[in-house]
From Swiss-Prot:
Subcellular location: Cell inner membrane
Catalytic activity, reaction form: ATP + H2O + polyamine-[polyamine-binding protein]Side 1 = ADP + phosphate + polyamineSide 2 + [polyamine-binding protein]Side 1
Gene3D superfamilies: 2.40.50.100, P-loop containing nucleotide triphosphate hydrolases
UniProt name for this protein: Spermidine/putrescine import ATP-binding protein PotA
Binding site for ATP: G43, P44, S45, G46, C47, G48, K49, T50
Keywords tagged on the record: ATP-binding, Cell inner membrane, Cell membrane, Membrane, Nucleotide-binding, Translocase, Transport
Pfam families tied to this protein: ABC_tran, TOBE_2
Record EC number: 7.6.2.11
Cysteines engaged in disulfide bonds, as pairs: none
Domain ABC transporter: 11-241
Amino acid sequence: MENQLQNKPIIELRSIKKSYGSNTIINDFNLTINNGEFVTILGPSGCGKTTVLRLLAGLEELDSGSIILDGEDITNVPAEKRHINTVFQSYALFPHMTIFENVAFGLRMQKVPNEEIKPRVLEALRMVQLEEMADRKPTQLSGGQQQRIAIARAVVNKPKVLLLDESLSALDYKLRKQMQQELKMLQRQLGITFIFVTHDQEEAITMSDRIVLLRKGKIAQDGSPREIYEDPANLFVARFIGEINVFEATVIERKSEQVVLANVEGRICDIYTDMPVEKDQKLQVLLRPEDIVIEELDENEHSKAIIGHIIDRTYKGMTLESTVEFDHNGMRVLVSEFFNEDDPHMDHSIGQRVGITWHEGWEVVLNDEDNQ
């Protein structure tokens, strides 16, 4: 029964359109979100992600299309009557009220009986581990504590969906990392559908069950963090999520259903793809920095790898990042290796001649024509 509830759609956006004047932000936009999911709507500035959130919250009106919440059409339902709450970037806490009164505010607006308010507020504060702060003012709390109070206020009236609008961006790095974990744990505890809007791909990967990546008002890819990172649908997705190296390739022949022999930046090698290809077709081979293998070479040593030289290196604690410039065309690639201080071949020096290969099958192969 629980799995059936989790697989049940809680939000459906059907063919929605929104314009501001002559500028169409989203058009014929469709999205289904299931009950209990933590979904992140991700994308660069101007992609339409905040517009989608505001439409869900009822803060903007649709030009056309419909919004369905738990089977009910709420397209024309005002914001205050939707079972959807929003945590904004600013948290919007009332500075003159105590924490208790901040959390109780929504219940009082809904005319909840006084005898119900105290236990519900304390329960919400207990969920975010701030019950002992009930009598303090927001200015007496840290940024992370204010974040949790804003969430407590948003969940106290038991919404079906919680929207979070870039609500971690004001925190410092360490606190932001901590809150990412706390938010995910809280979402699991509450069982409420969370829809998180951000431009930060690291946040999206860390917290989400599912990422919806937008580009110019369209869905560029919809999938799990792992699917989007390891199997990007196109070059935009690959470049937006993490670092990526893009190699030019030319098909020589298909060897099997999964394997193509190709010339990749001058290296004749197998690449793994089941897409239809023809001889001399141009492809792009995408490799994450951690997928690439560096082999140190003497200046006159022969190798079947792609040859280049180290032009920069950055120690990052657990990893060593090296920038390699290819000899044949000056292209630069980023390589990330787990740092091992006992390995004499790990700490590459500037100017070192190297050969570049990769773990077979870890590459992503895209059709050159599809990656504009």
